[in-house]
Amino acid sequence: MAHPPPPPNLTPLQSSDPRVIPPFAVHGRLGAGGMGVVYGAVGPDGRWAAVKVVRPEYAGEPEFRSRFASEVALMHRVRARCIAPVLAHDTRAELPWYATPYLPGPTLGARVRQGGALAPHQARVVAAGMAEAIAAIHAAGVVHRDLKPANVILAPDGPKVLDFGIARAADATALTRTGGLVGSPAWMSPERYRGTSGPEADVFAWGAMVAYTATGRPPFGDGGAETLMYRILREEPDLEGLPPELEEPVTRALDKDPASRPSAGELLHRVAAADPEAAAGADDTTIVDGLIRAHWAGGAVRGAPAPRTADD
């Protein structure tokens, strides 16, 4: 059986890598990270998938396995246009794994690093798509906990959010209980730094990522984890250059008080309502679909695919 062309960022398998993860035939690596390895594989339907396999040190933690199974089961039920769905999973395997479709396109982080800020209309698509995805995730009872530019793929048919819920499983392990903190410093909310987290933390990350998308720089700057923590806890974000229609929702999303932030559904509504081309009375999902068709058709945001990691 002829396989479709391989992903351009596929690298050769190592001697210890599996060649089959039923029902997927493994053809190479897409990337690796702290939590595991991402393999490029072909499913029974002939389509490419990204199969994310947990590292042994996590797989050996009973509490991690329990939470991982729970989170993946929830992820499998979430469906939204701007989410990469779970195709299959085996959380009882010696090394637990789950698979999502392989999505061609750069990550949001790679695209901004290579090309700078997105055009205002494209930034609005990313803002709306991420808000729609986060709202669907929260409606299913899941909190992403590690939203960052590496977890958003700018696919030809719109932005896609990856890997929601997995950071919660990692938080359960001895590897993090001994002092580590799961998350990415530039996108973490004040309460995450204080050791608590809920849906409001995802809203904060949305605000930081939309600002990054539209201005080309993180709203709390660059630097080490301690520097970023201080700025996020004590200083106001730099939102200079943010398009006017995104100023109000982003400012509210970045409020240091989680109780003062809007929900993801409210953010979606505000971004959708700001679309001057939206038909009167159209619902938010219809408006997002229209934004993607008008400003994203055929992969309007271009860039080379970046390596994927199991914790990106």
Task: For the regions a language model picked out, list residue spans one by one.
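Generic low-complexity segments that are intrinsically disordered, proline-rich and/or Lys/Arg-biased
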Residues: 296, 306-308
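Eukaryotic protein kinase
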Residues: 1-298
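Hydrophobic single-pass membrane-targeting/anchoring helices
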Residues: 310-312
